[in-house]
Amino acid sequence: MSFLRSFARNKDISKVGRRGIHCMQKLCAEKISPDSLEKAQNRVIDAALTLVRENTGLRKNLCHSLGGAVATSTLLGVPLGHNSSFLEGPAFAPPFIREGIWCGSANSTTEEGKDLKDLRIMVDVGDIPIQEMRDCGIGDERLMKVVSDSVKLVMEEDPLRPLILGGDPSISYPVVRAISEKLGGPVDVLHFDAHPDLYDEFEGNYYSHASSFARIMEGGYARRLLQVGIRSINKEGREQAKKFGVEQFEMRHFSKDRPFLENLNLGEGAKGVYISIDVDCLDPGYAVGVSHYESGGLSFRDVMNMLQNLKGDIVGGDVVEYNPQREPPDRMTAMVAAKFVRELAAKMSK
């Protein structure tokens, strides 16, 4: 019975995720002129960016009023799930992650002793209204630009640094692109994932969640890409890694690679370090609320050891692929994703 309920929920999600497609078809059927439609879409995009700009400016002013912050982690939700090839539930993740961050079952202090209630450590500027833009028929190329522009708006407000709540992994591409363009050069990327996400295209989708790191590498936005937790990879994934010079650390060799990975020093000669955490890097026993189950993954403490021991200036990060429709009502995986956000926020801030 629980399977049937889950199946029904996922069918509902699929309908919601395709709302933008249906809306575009309806707009075309009504014979609205392309010029009028584009003008209306541009106004919606301007409104979305204005929302991010005003929220970001307010949080910057609050940080400045307290004084002393060099880098403040800034949560920005990107509720996008339609580029997933399987389930689109990650579009609904940001509110559940936020609830996990602030729920009463844990205090606001991170493992290294930083209090997240201190606005110099972490602020939240809300979500980009992705679905509202899709409902206006705005396609992926323009959506990705809105994500990039939103990240740049965050970075314009010193000392704010972007920490993104996904969303499916396709969002990593426009975020890393924005950071690299804003800083004037490539960053080093530490990517935790069960999958390399290096397909040139997947099922004909240039912006697929399975292609995000191919887009990053071909754009020259990453100097080094280290992928940790890999255990679902085919011939194309390995060929693409070789083509782009990606350093892949597969789970079958993790015990041998652990000493190196727990003592990383990244970012020297680059514009900083970007951390991308796909929740399915973890073994499903630690995180059932993901779209793709791959047994034999990392433990939560494995990831924390690598993150907490990392040396380098972290200029941005994301936590993606949490799917609230794939777990029981206790939302345990939301707490896992929230813990990733909390500890990454602490690591980024200074």
Swiss-Prot record:
Cofactor(s) the protein needs: Mn(2+)
Domain of life: Eukaryota
Residues annotated as binding substrate: H195, P196, D197, L198, Y199, E203, G204, N205, N234, E321
Keywords: Arginine metabolism, Hydrolase, Manganese, Metal-binding
Keyword Transport: no
GO MF term (any one): agmatinase activity
Cofactor note: Binds 2 manganese ions per subunit.
Transmembrane spans: none
Name of one Pfam family that matches: Arginase
Leader sequence segment: none
Similarity annotation: Belongs to the arginase family.
Name listed for the protein in its UniProt record: Arginase
Organism placement in taxonomy: Eukaryota, Viridiplantae, Streptophyta, Embryophyta, Tracheophyta
Gene: AG1
